[in-house]
Design a protein with these regions (language model features):
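C-terminal domain-boundary segment and adjacent tail
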Residues: 66, 241-251, 269, 273-295, ...
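Metal-dependent polysaccharide deacetylase catalytic core of the NodB/CE4 family, i.e.
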Residues: 117-119, 123, 284-403, 498-507, ...
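Non-catalytic propeptide/linker segments at domain boundaries
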Residues: 198-254
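Catalytic domains of cell-wall/extracellular-matrix polysaccharide-remodeling enzymes
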Residues: 364-453
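Catalytic beta-strand/loop cores that center a nucleophilic Ser/Cys/Thr
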Residues: 144-215
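Catalytic grooves of carbohydrate-active enzymes
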Residues: 254-264, 268, 371, 378-393, ...
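Helical hinge/lid and interdomain linker segments adjacent to catalytic or ligand-binding clefts
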Residues: 31, 40-119, 297-298
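A glycine-rich, often tryptophan-bearing local segment used as a flexible ligand/cofactor-contacting loop or short
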Residues: 85, 89-169
Length: 549
């Protein structure tokens, strides 16, 4: 199998107020409002952000409603414990009724990025008098990038809990893969407003508030759901939601590890080495199993098509027998982890290609339906069951499938263990030529999501995986992602008070013909996560978030 790294990127305070309790005895009621303009090519972008926020709220026992801000009705904020407004579209008109209700309510309100000027500069509201801070301006790039100065800089570094979380960007080819815009605010009355988090502009040495709180009102200088990463300011919203909702979870940092793409071609010797290492360290682990191996084009079999059902997969069953006896738990990782007899997009081989998404055309596969996907899931479950295996969770191949496929999985698995791609429609049209196009957004989680937008329970994988440049063997595998990179991700992830360090590892990195230091680097990474103070846990036994003592 060819190793692949699929990086899922997003295309994309002190006045009297009434908290709603420290211990969560009833669901939090939350309203997420988003911009929904009827013109332009970003009509659904804020909806995508709203889905991502809704997912994070699924870490709590929460009832969440999503609604265009244009449809806001008078008095709605009083029906919810917390209302969030995602200002994702510049100067999208915010209803005056909403601003009036925000000004008068004692309920929690969180405003992100754009359009605060419509509220703060409106003479009908004494914004500065009420909240103790002012809105100054919108800031973006320090200058337009040029060949001579391709990285002019912007406010890109968020300081939080002693760590510098930097927005991801890449100036190659003149493309900046980050959102440089922030809303700049100024504290006018420290008795009313507090700058909770700071954002810095390293090129100009300027600082600005990233999060301001004035009693029940919170303001974020940007929308923290664009271009997210494991070292990004996205971790701030993941953590500080505990304070916004005023529902605290037990502070603990746990770690999980999963062996990936374990199929009929796995070498039992590599699984023995990996299993023994973890077993001797008393570290639980999971195994992502592909039940039915297919190479319909003969890509790795000299041009001859090859299929191996689990019942015939002698090497795989030997490996699983050894690993499960040492604590390994089974995750079902697709049925075949490839699609049809075609390249989708690489080889058509199990573990290499997408199964439930046409990645070549970036659309659902032709057969896509809940029934079609369900039949594949049932076939995979049957192969596992007939051979004595019961998976505790589902993992989508390459973390991307259609909404129909996701719903098929929800009805069959209580738990998933993965990252997820979300869509702004159940039958998404992602073509750039469509002015009202949909958006697909990839999201990882630093903690357990009890219920996401599609109804899934999601165990986190948030660090990524070790990758090596083996382009001399496979020209398309030319990417290095080191154990040190994952260690850095784990270190940054500690800002989340109940965050995980969860990663996966491909056993084939131990294959002699590949010639990488896979085993040594795996050991180093496990030791590094230990040294950071994480506690290894069995993914199959991870329960709901626990309230703080």
């Amino acid at each position: 199998m060819k190793p692949r790294l699929y990086a899922i990127a997003v295309a994309i305070c002190v006045v009297l107020w009434a908290p709603f309790g420290h211990a969560q005895t009833t669901p939090v009621k939350a309203l997420v409002l988003y911009d929904a303009p009827t013109t332009g090519s970003f009509q659904k972008l804020s909806f995508a952000y709203a889905i991502m926020l809704r997912n994070l709220l699924g870490h709590w026992n929460a009832d969440v409603d999503l609604q265009p801000v244009e449809q806001y009705a008078s008095g709605q904020v009083e029906q919810y414990d917390a209302t969030f407004y995602l200002g994702g579209i510049y100067d999208n008109q915010v209803p005056l009724t909403f601003m009036g209700d925000v000004f008068n309510t004692q309920k929690t309100v969180v405003w992100f990025k754009y359009n605060l000027w419509q509220f703060a500069w409106n003479p009908n509201f004494d914004f500065a008098g009420r909240y103790g801070f002012t809105y100054s301006a919108l800031r973006g790039m320090n200058a337009a990038p040029t060949a001579e100065n391709p990285a002019p800089g912007f406010f890109d570094t968020v300081d939080y809990k002693g760590k510098a979380l930097v927005k991801y960007y890449d100036f190659q080819n003149g493309t900046i893969n980050a959102d440089p815009d922030i809303g700049v605010t100024t504290i006018a009355d420290p008795a009313k407003a507090t700058q909770l988090v700071t954002i810095r502009n390293p090129k100009t040495n300027e600082q600005a508030p990233y999060i301001v709180r004035s009693g029940n009102f919170w303001y974020f200088a940007d929308v923290p759901f664009s271009y997210i990463g494991p070292r990004d300011r996205y971790l701030v919203i993941c953590d500080i939601l505990h304070d916004i909702l005023n529902v605290q979870h037990r502070k603990q940092h746990r770690a999980m590890v999963r062996f990936e793409d374990v199929s009929a071609l796995v070498l039992p010797s590599t699984m023995r080495r990996l299993s023994d290492f973890l077993f001797n360290r008393d570290i639980p682990f999971s195994i992502a199993v592909i039940p039915f191996y297919r190479d319909p084009l003969g890509e790795f079999n000299g041009g001859t098509p090859m299929e191996v059902h689990l019942a015939e997969a002698t090497r795989l069953k030997r490996a699983l027998k050894y690993a499960t006896a040492r604590g390994g738990k089974i995750v079902m990782h697709g049925y075949t982890h490839q699609y049809d007899a075609k390249r989708n997009p690489h080889s058509g081989v199990s573990g290499d290609d997408f199964e439930f998404w046409d990645i070549v055309d970036n659309t659902p596969v032709l057969e896509d339906s809940v029934e079609w996907a369900g039949a594949r899931l049932d076939a995979g479950l049957l192969e596992l069951k007939q051979n004595g295996y019961t998976p505790f969770a589902w993992e989508t191949p390459h973390y991307q499938s259609s909404p129909n496929s996701i719903r098929a999985a929800v009805s069959r698995f209580k738990t998933t263990y993965q990252r997820v791609v979300y869509y702004t429609d159940d039958t998404p049209d992602l073509s750039a030529s469509n002015p009202a196009r949909d958006f697909a957004v990839g999201q990882f989680f630093p903690y357990v999501i009890e219920k996401d937008y599609y109804g899934q329970r999601v165990l986190p994988e948030n660090l990524g995986n070790i990758e090596y440049d083996i382009s001399d063997i496979d020209p398309t595998s030319n990417f290095n992602y080191t154990w040190q990179d994952l260690r850095l991700n784990a270190n940054m992830g500690k800002v989340v008070r109940d965050g995980f360090a969860s990663f996966f590892f491909h056993p084939f990195w131990l294959d002699p013909e590949i010639g990488t230091p896979g085993m040594a680097d795996f050991r180093r990474l496990v030791n590094a996560i230990d040294a950071l103070g994480y506690r290894w846990v069995d993914a199959s036994r991870v329960g709901a978030p626990q309230p703080a003592n």
